[in-house]
């Protein structure tokens, strides 16, 4: 079975041509994660999300799947008035995320919850203006159900 990309490679290349790191620290976190083969946002996805967040200006963001905290740090940087809540099931990754949010100087606006999002997401109180699910793809529907109730 031949798996084709979601977007045309020419479109991806075009979008990548607009990519610029948001800060030197975020660039360092990206490079380190990529070197360690830890998945972070693709550059074209980051460009799209930065545009979307700039237009929407959410004040509360939920992320499922923190990994090293790159996306959460990016979201907090793009949206300086927002509070980001992120859920990570892996203790080591949650620790890395905590360290990286400190490095990015956004830890005061990011809450990292350690646990399985299928269990913890429904326990979080409040309404989120923006939700980003970036965890185990096979559980996306369960994460969605936990988030929207």
Which residue ranges define each predicted feature?
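A short alpha-helical cap/connector motif
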Residues: 1-130, 137-149
């Amino acid at each position: 079975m031949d798996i084709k990309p979601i977007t045309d490679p020419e479109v991806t290349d075009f979008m990548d041509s607009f990519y610029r790191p948001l800060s030197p620290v975020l660039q360092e976190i990206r490079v380190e994660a990529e070197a360690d083969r830890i998945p972070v946002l693709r550059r074209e996805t980051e460009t799209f999300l930065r545009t979307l967040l700039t237009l929407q200006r959410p004040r509360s963001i939920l992320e499922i799947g923190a990994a090293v905290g790159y996306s959460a740090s990016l979201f907090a940087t793009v949206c300086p008035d927002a509070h980001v809540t992120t859920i990570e099931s892996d203790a080591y990754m949650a620790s890395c995320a905590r360290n990286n949010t400190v490095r990015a100087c956004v830890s005061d606006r990011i809450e990292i919850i350690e646990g399985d999002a299928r269990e913890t997401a429904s326990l979080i109180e409040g309404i989120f203006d923006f939700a980003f699910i970036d965890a185990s793809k096979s559980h996306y529907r369960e994460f969605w159900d936990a988030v929207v109730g």
